[in-house]
Structure formats: structure tokens, C-alpha cells
């Protein structure tokens, strides 16, 4: 590297840094130094005890090539069509544009060492960690020639997940839970089934104390920008605590200090350092650490443009960059210098990429790289392999019933605390029921009253449908990323999630229809009698649950909330048209007849009208106008609409639709999790 490049980097660093590195190095009372040198780490006693790890893992990888699809923007409808094509069509033979993200990367992480992956934004740090943790996103492909080994034994995703904890950069939580409730759920499904619930709760208390979460343990996590809750630093510590519950032998952390102040960043890295000293293998990415934090790293891996620019100790890094003519200036933070040397400078892209290519080429043929290759061959030749026991070979830590119980508990608490699901919906239901009741108040048994009652009954169905579909889409799509991550981490099965969530939300979907019918039914003056009331209540309750199931299906088939909200109404309208109000059931075209059997509007509207008019005898309906058709009895009113008196058939139809939509939603979510694996 030329003198001009070095001067340019130094000037850039001076512009970005308000306080000189020299003053930081000469001031022993800096925040990071105080965190490291003080007794702060003593509060982590139980988490970082001196006990040796049960299993020590050397993680090595070689010839790692990662390719990603080039994103092609499109509308929500186009994305939905592509998803449907992906489900029913074999896309393997359709060539897609790809980008080479990680290029022939090799490396090794030893037990007892803290390996820090550094590089500028876009260097490939997160992509590398996702590949190492077998958590690559959809559309990202790992080359078949890539080798990933633990103790010289090639591993797959299941073996890695049994031994590795992965703290990802973005924190995903159920925002309505408290920090303690979240950790209780995580401990229940993460920790071995041989442990009692009391032991798991003791571990939760221990981790809460270790990571300084005592003050915020009963604070709701919240949703950034929507519901106030934990701070960014507290959320990051909570994510770390979730993974620390099981005390894993291999820990991979993507930007664990992101969003933390300097004191907490230093404390978190100190904890990771202590974990590595216990014999654990720790890999983390970090963006431009302070000089104090940089000294904690046993090894550093510098990434640039998807390639390895250096892998070795900090001392070896100084020698390497000095050898290639890029010596770090005196009193300059080495981490800042390396990142800036390997960054693509705006306006100097060609020159920067040429410099990066030369650095990576020099490392590939250098002494450190050759020694690493020899060590890799020695590791691959080992025969000790991996320990095999029940805890590492079992797919899920918790039993099926434990998973189901934990999910049902979490879903029930979340439902009670979610304002959109409880308070707002109850108020909305009451207001709409009162409004409809006032508009159609005490309808008389006349030909006009018959028309009004029929319209009011159909309003029951449209209100229940759209209220539940949109409520589910708004809440469930926000929870889907959490579901996807937790199922990929093998915390629970897809079927236990769906069953537990369904049963937890069932009381709400029983209360809302009851509240609505209890208000609107008597105000309108519908057919009196407890039997008629309960029949109407049963039908409206089933409609609420069918529409909820349909909302689950849309949510599971959509990639985002905006997409689900865009496609939800157009998909609902066809079912509404077959309800018998806009189109007589006897006039449905033959080619659409099959679709009418999936319309819950049809079954419910027919059932409610049969319940209302089937036993109305001739003479009960008063004809007050000679200019309009007047049904002489309830049977005539039903025949006009082409309805048959088969009430139980409508009930069975709605129950069947609930099962169909729930199963379809489960299959959609299951296929998404399969594609992610």
C-alpha cells in the first residue's frame, strides 16, 4: 500500500473520531477500561464459572462458497404468484441470477479462544456466520464442496444445532411478554427434559442476575416504534441470556454489542471472553471495537468483499500488514485501521477493490495461511470425533407435551396482554353491535322487515369475517418471524405451535361472537326462543373461527404484513359473493360451483336465515304494501332465496372449513420452515 493511501486513511479516521486514540490509551479511567478492569465481571460468577466445559469443540471450515439470489423487486401480487409457483412447481431447473457472497473462505476456531470477525459493512460477516451456523436465509446456497467440521468430523444442521447457540443480530421477541416470562418459556423448551421445572426456573433466576436484568425482568419487552418496553441494550442482553441458558460448547454471536453503550458492550465481550476461557469456542462479529475490546480477542478474522484478508492473532496481524506496506500508525486503534484499509471508499471504488484484492492474495499465499492449512489438515485427520449422547442426538430438548404446554402458556399470556386482540376488539365488537342494533331496531314482521332482517344477518357475517381476518393478519404476521426462528432452532415443532396457539386464542373467539350476538340479536328483534338464540350464536361463533383460520392461512402464505393486508380483501371477496345476498345460490355458474362450497358466508347465511324463517307460519308476516312481493310464510322466504331447510348441513360445512383452512395454514408454515432449513 502506498504512502498516499495511508495518509488518506489517517485523515478519514481523524474526521470520524472526536477524541484521539492517544488520549484514550493514556487515560486509565475510560469506560471500557473500567468495565474490564473493575470487579464488574464478578457479577457473572455463575455464568462464567471456572468449571470446564463438558465438550470442547474445534470448529473448522474450508472451501466455503456462498451464493445469493439477486433480488428482483415486484409487487405484492407478483411475490404471491412466485410463492405459489415455488410451492407447486419445481424451480430447480430454472436458472436464476446469483451473486458470489463468500469466496473460498477457510478458517478454524479453537476451544478456549475468542475469535472476532471484523470488516466493513457489506464485507460478508453476517453471511459467513449464517453459513457457519447453518442458518442461511432463503435463496442463499452453500457450495457442495464446502466443508464444515467439529473436531474433524463433518457436521450437518442437526448436529450443529445440538451443540451451537447462535445469537443473531436482529432481536426477535413476543413484545407483549415480560423479560422474565420470555426466559421462562425459553428455559422450558431449550433445557433438557431431564431437568425439573424448578431447576429450569432456578437457571432463569441465575441468568437474570448474571446479565443484570433484575430491574427490567418484569418490564414488557415491547415493540420498537409501537409499544414502549425494554431499551436496545436490555433487548440485546435478553437475547444473549436466551442462548446462555443452555451453556452451549459453541457460541456464535452476530454483533452482540450492537445497540449497547460502551460500558455494557465491554461487559458483554468480557463475558464472552470468560466463556472462552472455560474451554468454549466463541465466534463473534463486531464492528470497529475500541482498542480495549480489541485486546480481548485471541484471534481476529478480517473479511473484505467476501474474502479472508487475515486470520490470526492481533500480533500476527501487525506483522502481516507491516509486511505488505500497510503499517498501523502509532497511537492508532488497530481495529479501526484494519477496517478502513479493507473498506471500499466512495468515489475510489476501483482503487479500493484493487487494494483489497492484493491484500487477500498476499494472505492466501503467506506464512500464516499456510500454517492454517496445515492445522486444518491435522484437525481433519483426527479420529476422536464428537461425543454422542442423548442430549446431542435428540431433535428437540422438550417433549411434545412440554412444547405444547409452553406455547399455550405463552400464547395465552400474549393474548391477554395484546391490546389489539382484547381491549380494542371488545370495544369494537360492542360498538358495532350497538350500531347495527340501533339501525335495525325492533324490525316488524312485514315484507320490508324481512328484507331488513336478511340484511342485518348478513352484516353479522361480514363484521365477524373482516374483524377476525384483519386482527389475525396484524398480530400473527408480526409473530411469524419469531416462529420461523424458533422452529429453525428446534425449540418446538410446527404442530405444537399451531395447536397450542389455536387453543390459547379459542376463549377470545368464543367471547367476541357471544358479546356481539347478545347485544344485536335482541335489539333487532330476531326470532325469539333460547334454541334460536343458541343456534345463531353457534353459527356466528363458527364464522369467527373460520375467518380466523383463513387469516392464519393468508399470514402463513405471505412474506410480510403489508403483503397479507394487500391480498387479504381480494381473496375474501369471492367467498362473500357466494353468500346468497348478491347472487342467488341457484344462479351460481357451473364453473364456479366448486368455489361456493368453500364460502363460509354461504353456509352461515343459509343457516342463520333457516334459523330465522323456517318455523314462521303463514299469517305471521304482515303484508303492508301491495307494490312489493310479500312472502306469506318463512318457507316462502327461504324458497325465494333458493335455500333448503338443512340446518345441520351448514354447521358441518363450517366446521369442515375450519379444519381445511387450519390444515392449509399449517402446511404453508411447515413448507416455509422446510425451505429455510
From Swiss-Prot:
The keyword Translocase does not apply. It is found in: Membrane. Residues 82-330 form the ABC transporter domain. SUPFAM superfamilies: P-loop containing nucleoside triphosphate hydrolases. InterPro entries: AAA+_ATPase (IPR003593), ABC2_TM (IPR013525), ABC_transporter-like_ATP-bd (IPR003439), ABC_transporter-like_CS (IPR017871), ABCG_dom (IPR043926), ABCG_transporters (IPR050352), P-loop_NTPase (IPR027417), Pigment_permease/Abcg (IPR005284). Keywords: ATP-binding, Membrane, Nucleotide-binding, Pigment, Transmembrane, Transmembrane helix, Transport. Gene3D superfamilies: P-loop containing nucleotide triphosphate hydrolases. ATP binds at residues 119-126. It is a multi-pass membrane protein. The chain crosses the membrane at residues 431-451, 456-476, 506-526, 534-554, 563-583, 647-667. May be part of a membrane-spanning permease system necessary for the transport of pigment precursors into pigment cells responsible for eye color. This is Protein white. It comes from Lucilia cuprina.
Amino acid at each position: 500500500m502506498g504512502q498516499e493511501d495511508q495518509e488518506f486513511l489517517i485523515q478519514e479516521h481523524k474526521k470520524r473520531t472526536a477524541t484521539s486514540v492517544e488520549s484514550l490509551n493514556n487515560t486509565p479511567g475510560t469506560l471500557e477500561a473500567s468495565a474490564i478492569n473493575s470487579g464488574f465481571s464478578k457479577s457473572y460468577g455463575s455464568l462464567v464459572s471456572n468449571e470446564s466445559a463438558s465438550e470442547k469443540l474445534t470448529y473448522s471450515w474450508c472451501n466455503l462458497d456462498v451464493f445469493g439470489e439477486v433480488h428482483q423487486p415486484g409487487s405484492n401480487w407478483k411475490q404471491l404468484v412466485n410463492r405459489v409457483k415455488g410451492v407447486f412447481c419445481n424451480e430447480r431447473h430454472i436458472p436464476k441470477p446469483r451473486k458470489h457472497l463468500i469466496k473460498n473462505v477457510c478458517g478454524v476456531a479453537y476451544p478456549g479462544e475468542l475469535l472476532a470477525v471484523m470488516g466493513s459493512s457489506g464485507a460478508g460477516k453476517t453471511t459467513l456466520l449464517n453459513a457457519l451456523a447453518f442458518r442461511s436465509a432463503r435463496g442463499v446456497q452453500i457450495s457442495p464442496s464446502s466443508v464444515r467440521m467439529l473436531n474433524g468430523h463433518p457436521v450437518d444442521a442437526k448436529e450443529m444445532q445440538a451443540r451451537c447457540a447462535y445469537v443473531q443480530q436482529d432481536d426477535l421477541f413476543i413484545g407483549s411478554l415480560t423479560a422474565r416470562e420470555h426466559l421462562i418459556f425459553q428455559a422450558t423448551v431449550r433445557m433438557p427434559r431431564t431437568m425439573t421445572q424448578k431447576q429450569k426456573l432456578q437457571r432463569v433466576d441465575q441468568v437474570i442476575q448474571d446479565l443484570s436484568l433484575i430491574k427490567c425482568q418484569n418490564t414488557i419487552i415491547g415493540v420498537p416504534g409501537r409499544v414502549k418496553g425494554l431499551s436496545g441494550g436490555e433487548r440485546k442482553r435478553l437475547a444473549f441470556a436466551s442462548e446462555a441458558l443452555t451453556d452451549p460448547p459453541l457460541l456464535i454471536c452476530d454483533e452482540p454489542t450492537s445497540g449497547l453503550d460502551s460500558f455494557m458492550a465491554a461487559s458483554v465481550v468480557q463475558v464472552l471472553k470468560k466463556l472462552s476461557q472455560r474451554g468454549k469456542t466463541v465466534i463473534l462479529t463486531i464492528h470497529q471495537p475500541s482498542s480495549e475490546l480489541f485486546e480481548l480477542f485471541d484471534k481476529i478474522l478480517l473479511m473484505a468483499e467476501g474474502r479472508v484478508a487475515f486470520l490470526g492473532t492481533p500480533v500476527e496481524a501487525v506483522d502481516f500488514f507491516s509486511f505488505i506496506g500497510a503499517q498501523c500508525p502509532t497511537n492508532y486503534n488497530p481495529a479501526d485501521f484494519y477496517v478502513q484499509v479493507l473498506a471500499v471508499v466512495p468515489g475510489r471504488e476501483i482503487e479500493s477493490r484493487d487494494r483489497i484484492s492484493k491484500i487477500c492474495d498476499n494472505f492466501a499465499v503467506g506464512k500464516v495461511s499456510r500454517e492454517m492449512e496445515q492445522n486444518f489438515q491435522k484437525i481433519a485427520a483426527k479420529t476422536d470425533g464428537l461425543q454422542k449422547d442423548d442430549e446431542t442426538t435428540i431433535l428437540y430438548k422438550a417433549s411434545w407435551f412440554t412444547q405444547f404446554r409452553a406455547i399455550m402458556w405463552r400464547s395465552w399470556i400474549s393474548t391477554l396482554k395484546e391490546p389489539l386482540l382484547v381491549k380494542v376488539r371488545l370495544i369494537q365488537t360492542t360498538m358495532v353491535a350497538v350500531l347495527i342494533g340501533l339501525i335495525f331496531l325492533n324490525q316488524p314482521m312485514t315484507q320490508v322487515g324481512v328484507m331488513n332482517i336478511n340484511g342485518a344477518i348478513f352484516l353479522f357475517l361480514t363484521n365477524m369475517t373482516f374483524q377476525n381476518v384483519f386482527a389475525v393478519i396484524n398480530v400473527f404476521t408480526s409473530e411469524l418471524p419469531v416462529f420461523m426462528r424458533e422452529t429453525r432452532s428446534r425449540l418446538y415443532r410446527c404442530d405444537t405451535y399451531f395447536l397450542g396457539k389455536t387453543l390459547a386464542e379459542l376463549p377470545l373467539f368464543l367471547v367476541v361472537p357471544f358479546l356481539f350476538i347478545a347485544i344485536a340479536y335482541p335489539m333487532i328483534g330476531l326470532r325469539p326462543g333460547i334454541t334460536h338464540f343458541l343456534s345463531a350464536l353457534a353459527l356466528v361463533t363458527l364464522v369467527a373461527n373460520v375467518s380466523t383460520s383463513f387469516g392464519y392461512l393468508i399470514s402463513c402464505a405471505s412474506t410480510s404484513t403489508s403483503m397479507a393486508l394487500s391480498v387479504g380483501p381480494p381473496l375474501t371477496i369471492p367467498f362473500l359473493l357466494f353468500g346468497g345476498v348478491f347472487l342467488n345460490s341457484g344462479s351460481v355458474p357451473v364453473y364456479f360451483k366448486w368455489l361456493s362450497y368453500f364460502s363460509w358466508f354461504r353456509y352461515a347465511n343459509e343457516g342463520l336465515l333457516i334459523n330465522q324463517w323456517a318455523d314462521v307460519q303463514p299469517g305471521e308476516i304482515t303484508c303492508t304494501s301491495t307494490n312489493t312481493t310479500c312472502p306469506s310464510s318463512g318457507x316462502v322466504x327461504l324458497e325465494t332465496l333458493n335455500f333448503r331447510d338443512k340446518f345441520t348441513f351448514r354447521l358441518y360445512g363450517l366446521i369442515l372449513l375450519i379444519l381445511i383452512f387450519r390444515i392449509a395454514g399449517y402446511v404453508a408454515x411447515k413448507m416455509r420452515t422446510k425451505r429455510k432449513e
